[in-house]
A protein has these predicted regions:
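Cys/His-rich short segments
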Residues: 152-169
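Helicase motor core with emphasis on the C-terminal RecA-like subdomain
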Residues: 1-152
């Protein structure tokens, strides 16, 4: 977990230093950010594809198939990507935005290293992520009980990000 300054540049440095040419998943909170991130990575010479629920189904399926079958593809995705994905050689899972819960983070990062080889979980985290998610919770049309549950989950995620002890496994 790194302090977010310029998340895309930080991601690029991480990929070039540790995962050049390897398969991975970059999770983003919005569809727009998925598209922008995939385009950015492609412009930097990294084979990246977007995946989100707003894409035409044939394009989404083609991108998923390419990711599953080919080596070295990076998938920029929302949480819509993941169910049924069992690519054993995913070397990293990165988050450009704070996940909504520890449970979600655990599930998403668990998609890396299924072949038993070393893999990394990486996240760029900043206080603005918390502010944005709190606003999304506050402005949602959910009932107050559900909003409280979401707030507790966000607080737990914040606790993980702010802990000073080692998170390396």
């Amino acid at each position: 977990i790194v302090e977010k300054a310029n998340a895309r540049a930080q991601l690029l440095a991480f990929l070039r230093a540790e995962h050049e040419g390897e398969a991975g998943i970059v999770y983003c909170l919005s569809r727009r950010k998925v598209e922008e991130t995939a385009a950015f990575l492609c412009a930097e010479g990294i084979r990246a594809l977007p995946y989100h629920a707003g894409m035409d189904s044939p394009v989404r399926e083609r991108n998923q198939t390419t990711f599953q079958r080919e080596d070295g593809v990076v998938m920029a995705a929302t949480i819509a990507f993941g169910m049924g994905i069992d690519k054993p050689d995913v070397r990293f899972v990165a988050h450009l935005d704070l996940p909504k819960s520890i449970e979600g983070y655990y599930q998403e990062t668990g998609r890396a290293g299924r072949d038993g080889m070393a893999a990394n979980a990486w996240m760029a985290y900043g206080l603005q992520d918390v502010v944005l998610q709190r606003r999304m919770i506050d402005e949602s049309e959910a009932d107050e009980t559900f909003k409280r549950v979401l707030g507790v989950k966000l607080d737990a995620m914040l606790g993980l990000c702010e802990t000073l002890s080692c998170r390396r496994m």
